[in-house]
């Protein structure tokens, strides 16, 4: 089974990816994350240590999303959670949280 977790380098996504990797032995787990947050870059290393591949781009880029390999299951864990960012960068937060989720 091939599983993609969007927001896979975030707190929820990375822990879910590692959990699924341990529970479903023959699963191919992949992550998609834009790595904007510092914690995401650190979690990318954790995922690599568990043999979980990461695709690095923002899900609002639908043309790139369409070029990904086919997956049996996509779990959407991506979002821009920072309240302060939503005040400063309304368009970016809207595009990530709404347009990006629509693309998934």
Region annotations inferred by a language model:
Residues 1-104:
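N-terminal Rossmann-like NAD(P)+-binding domain of SDR-like oxidoreductases, especially those catalyzing
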């Amino acid at each position: 089974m091939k599983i993609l977790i969007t927001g896979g380098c975030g707190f929820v996504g990375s822990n879910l990816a590692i959990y699924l990797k341990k529970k479903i032995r023959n699963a191919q787990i992949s992550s998609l994350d834009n790595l904007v947050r510092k914690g995401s870059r650190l979690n990318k290393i954790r995922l690599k240590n568990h043999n979980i591949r990461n695709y690095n781009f923002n899900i609002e880029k639908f043309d790139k999303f369409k070029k990904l390999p086919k997956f049996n299951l996509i779990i959407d864990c991506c979002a821009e959670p920072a309240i302060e960012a939503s005040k400063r960068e309304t368009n970016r937060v809207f595009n990530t949280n709404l347009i990006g989720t629509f693309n998934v």
